[in-house]
Amino acid sequence: MPVCRWKPEHLGLFYGLLGSMLFACKGILIKLAYRHGVSTETFLGLRMMWAAPFFAWVAWRSDGAALRRRWRWRRQAPAGMTGHSDDATPRADSVWRSGDVWRVAGLGFSGYYLASYLDFLGLQYVSAGLERVLLYLGPTFVLLLSVFWLKRPVSRTQWTALGVSYLGVILVYLHDLDGSLQVNVPLGSALVLGSCLSYSFYLVGAGEMVRRLGPMRLTAWASLVACVLCVTQALLVGGADMFRQPTEVQGIALMTAIFCTVFPLFLTTASVNHLGAGKAAQVGMIGPVWTIFLGAVVLGEPTGGLQIVGTAVVILGVLILSRAATRA
């Protein structure tokens, strides 16, 4: 019986599409949870509480063996030698350097705690479709940070892509400004854009550490930092309320943690390994379209010509930007 073997490119395409579509469901599930009256802090704490064991497993897979070697060495080393840092110590072959713990903590705060918190807050005021389109501006924020912070040159094509992307966002924004659709579109948009900016700082600041630690190790440890912050915040704000939520809210939080947080991480990483970062990013362009479709079907969010055209324009702008970055 013949065995069907997928080519690496086809596997990468499948992983990328599935990961993008799962991640695009996040806003839909959060909106469903809000219908049960749960607070932002409580639901975010629940999501990260359920996700923490998976990130801890990845972190242990990455560094568990090295930690065990170091612990055994400390037990067996002569008195007064445990602080010595010559080539005989387990630290000598470690990818971690002095100060990395604080760098990872800062990246976890910016990229996974603050970005998530602002995003969850923003979804109280804007549609899931607008939220996804605004988050899709991430590459343009990274470009602007590279210009004004890192002083890197930008080509005319990149500036064109920037203008096209923001034109599309304006169109989608105008669609959501209909008073019958949302509560406070300007506030919600500002919060989601703040989330996007916070995550862009993470992307710009994580470059050297990603190359040295690897994407999975860095993501796991930074996410664990965010898990601690989110759960602590939920307990400080609501006490034990996060443990007294109805089954529906607990189930939605678990689904958000597994299917919209953990799985997309592994699938996107696998897609990048098979396709490369440029092509994987282009595959991810299905995200905003899928969110708008689910918003209409699951949440009953109205769609319109401005939203559809604006989303297409944003995708075009990001596509131009990603291709320009690939050629650079």
Regions found by a protein language model. Name each.
Residues M1-L46, A51, F109, L121, ...:
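Glycine-/small-residue-enriched transmembrane alpha-helix faces in small-molecule transporters
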Residues K7-L13, G37-E41, G45, W96-D100, ...:
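Juxtamembrane helix-entry segments on the extracytoplasmic side of multipass membrane proteins
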Residues G16, D100-V104, V154-Y166, L213-A222, ...:
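Cytoplasmic-side transmembrane-helix entry/capping segments in multi-pass membrane proteins
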Residues G19, K31, F55, V142-L144, ...:
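Transmembrane alpha-helical segments that form core, pore/gating elements
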Residues S20, G45-L46, L130-L137, L203-V228, ...:
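Helix-helix packing/entry segments at the starts of transmembrane helices
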Residues L22, G27, S62-R68, W73-L135, ...:
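Specific transmembrane alpha-helical segments of multi-pass solute transporters/efflux pumps
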Residues T42-P53, G111, S116-P153, Q158, ...:
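Specific alpha-helical transmembrane segments that line the substrate/conduction pathway
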Residues F55, L145, V154-D176, C230, ...:
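Hydrophobic transmembrane alpha-helices of multi-pass small-molecule transport proteins
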